[in-house]
A protein has these predicted regions:
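PRPP-associated nucleotide enzymes
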Residues: 1-176
Length: 176
């Protein structure tokens, strides 16, 4: 969730990033030439910038507020998303409110399509239903949390395996 977490352990910890896996997937999946990476909030700017750098595309940021816990309200979109294919990237999706609201705001500002890449899909409550009924063309989550049953009949949710990343990390640790 945050690189700083490594400081709380008394043993070596490797923080693994799904960004290269997301970039590889996006290059295959998204055919548009007009792409922009989007942070769903100011806190996710570095994550979106990292994916944008790998894809060689620009950056936009959704400025949101939380009027109450569990609720998010989009205030503004920083960056030009008009006629762009937007790729939102985040670390965790729980209730889905932030991502669904961000996607809706991007479409309202002229985005052609909205793709979403999330490392950890908690998908609590009615999150799957929110995503299924949203403007999101495709939401990709990794398999760090088992969501096969929750997502198996949802056309716009895809689960991407990070077993290769985990296996490579373990191999490198055991060989060092």
């Amino acid at each position: 969730h945050a690189g700083q977490i490594q400081g709380f352990f008394d043993i070596p910890v490797d923080n693994l990033f799904s960004t290269p896996i997301f970039a590889r997937h996006a290059r295959k999946k998204i055919k548009s030439k007009k792409i922009i990476c989007v942070a769903p909030d100011v806190g996710g700017t570095e994550r979106a910038r990292a994916l944008g750098k790998l894809l060689n595309v620009g950056l936009a940021i959704v400025d949101k507020r939380r009027p109450k816990p569990g609720q998010s309200q989009v205030m503004n979109v920083i960056g030009d998303v008009q006629n762009q294919t937007c790729i939102i990237v985040d670390d965790i999706i729980d209730s889905g409110g932030t991502i669904v609201n961000a996607a809706k705001a991007l479409k309202a500002r002229g985005a052609k399509e909205v793709y979403v890449y999330i490392t950890h899909g908690v998908l609590s409550g009615d999150a799957v239903k929110k995503i299924k009924n949203s403007v999101i063309k495709n939401l990709v989550i990794t398999d760090t949390i088992d969501n096969v049953e929750k997502t198996k009949n949802v056309k716009n949710i895809e689960v991407l395996s990070i077993s290769g990343l985990m296996g490579e990390a373990m191999k490198r640790i055991s060989n060092s």
